Amino acid sequence: MTEPVAAEVGRDFIRDIIQADLDQAKYREIVTRFPPEPNGYLHIGHAKSIALNFGIAQEFPGRCHLRFDDTNPVKEEQEYIDSIQADVHWLGFDWGKNLFFASDYFDRLYEWAETLIRDGLAYVDDQTQEEIRTSRGTLTEPGKNSPFRDRSVDENLDLFRRMKAGEFPNGARVLRAKIDMAAGNINLRDPVLYRILHAHHPRTGNAWCIYPSYDYAHGQSDAIEGITHSICTLEFEDHRPLYDWFIEKLPVPSKPHQYEFARLNLTYTLLSKRVLTQLVREGHVAGWDDPRMPTMAGMRRRGVPPAALREFVKRIGVAKANSVVDVGMLEFCIREELNRTAQRRMAVLKPLKVVIENYPEGQTEELEAINHPDDPSAGTRKITFGRELYIEQDDFMENPPKKFFRLSPGNEVRLRYAYFVKCTGVIKNESGEVVELRCTYDPATRGGNAPDGRKVKATMHWLSAAASKPAEIRIYNQLFANPSPDASNFAADLNPQSLEILSNARVEASVAESNSTEPMQFERQGYFVRDKDSTPGKPVFSRTIGLRDTFAKEVAKG
């Protein structure tokens, strides 16, 4: 299990409210909660809520509950419950013994529903879902009372108990709160509290065939658990009067209060569950953990460090108004963390063979390479140098422009940790493509410096042809080419270059043979992580992020 991390202390309007509540001795302990519905995978927007709620509980201190809002058995699966718990732990937080489910409270919620009926505050409605929707009115027109609104308490209790007993089919009846069909806030126009749903529940089995609505279950679950600050995103602001109405009318054991903050919106990103589901179902991505997905599973597979996500959430802060955050800020946080923690290795993504003609045939030597330039404790490793090497295709040009300083005919460059080499010949295939270079090396320049003081303007990475291993490299870019993709027609904004697969790459032998899932920097290329699709003899590495933002520049150029 992941060790809990220390919360980053940051000031915002929610923390200011909590501090004021503590200063006034309003609460002895702060209790927050993260309440996901187990009907899908968490995404980066949820990471903001997780870090906020768990961070507050650590900072003040207090406790944060993980509570699953499992009130819709048709959409909920154990797979999602497991993945959500794994995501919270991966992000660096732990709920300890405070794991709860809304279904834990089904009996009490039912009893309180009967309380509302007895108090004349709820009734059974026989209207269809469409009739209820139509009769609620609009923002400018009041709703119309249901013809069943004035049923007696006894009749409502009888019908509600028969609903619970399973006498009626799905959709035949609902239980509604009796509030005000002319209320300016449509959420107060007799909202549905219970609906009939004959479906197997992951935890309660077939014990229930009526299920509470989110609006009814949510606040009462908070009250049962002693939540002091119920923090949610802005789309629930209009639901707060209903939240408070239930708390006021029912004999709940505590009086929580709801606070709203701005949800996370990112450029080049859509977080709608509908869109993410379509992306998976329609085959635009290879599953919920596809590294292009904004899901936490996708980011974890891509090698994004959880510390980078926590830092990103800290930087964007907690606000009252919605805004769009440039994805470049997230990428900056990822690069900063990986630059600090990732060990360095060498990989050649598009190999071009080099033969060092004056290097003895059959001879090899071991050179020392540093694992991290800023962390001496990371140590060094041995890399093999020999007569035949690989360099990047892009590091050679036969007819280079004026400011191209890498390898070209007659030009000398430094091979990192090795020697100066000079290109003396070019071999092409029948199509005129360069397939091999002939070079010479200067034995006196071992380690990268010339005794005579001559300088070179380029240092290139390389690999031994004999000592390196084949690998598949997956270069991921933004899933959408449009910085503001259209959720209603997202397919039109998909980036056709979001994935490039390089099947003939080469990596250091130790990299190919290691099963480590820690991200590493392939020097001059970017940060990469071993993918779960790796097989014996054919490792697969996914790019977490490049060393610099090139995608935005390509988009700008059109």
Curated annotation (Swiss-Prot):
It is found in: Cytoplasm. L-glutamine binds at residues 69, 214. The keyword Protein biosynthesis applies. The keyword Iron does not apply. Its EC number is 6.1.1.18. A motif ('HIGH' region) lies at residues 36-46. One of its GO terms (molecular function) is ATP binding. It catalyses: tRNA(Gln) + L-glutamine + ATP = L-glutaminyl-tRNA(Gln) + AMP + diphosphate. PROSITE patterns: AA_TRNA_LIGASE_I. Its main location: cytoplasm. GO terms for biological process: glutaminyl-tRNA aminoacylation; glutamyl-tRNA aminoacylation. Disulfide bonds: none annotated. InterPro entries: aa-tRNA-synth_I_CS (IPR001412), Gln-tRNA-synth (IPR004514), Gln/Glu-tRNA_Ligase (IPR050132), Gln_tRNA_ligase_bac (IPR022861), Glu/Gln-tRNA-synth (IPR000924), Glu/Gln-tRNA-synth_Ib_cat-dom (IPR020058), Glu/Gln-tRNA-synth_Ib_codon-bd (IPR020059), Glu_tRNA_lig_a-bdl (IPR020061). Keywords: Aminoacyl-tRNA synthetase, ATP-binding, Cytoplasm, Ligase, Nucleotide-binding, Protein biosynthesis. Monomer. This is Glutamine--tRNA ligase. The gene is glnS.
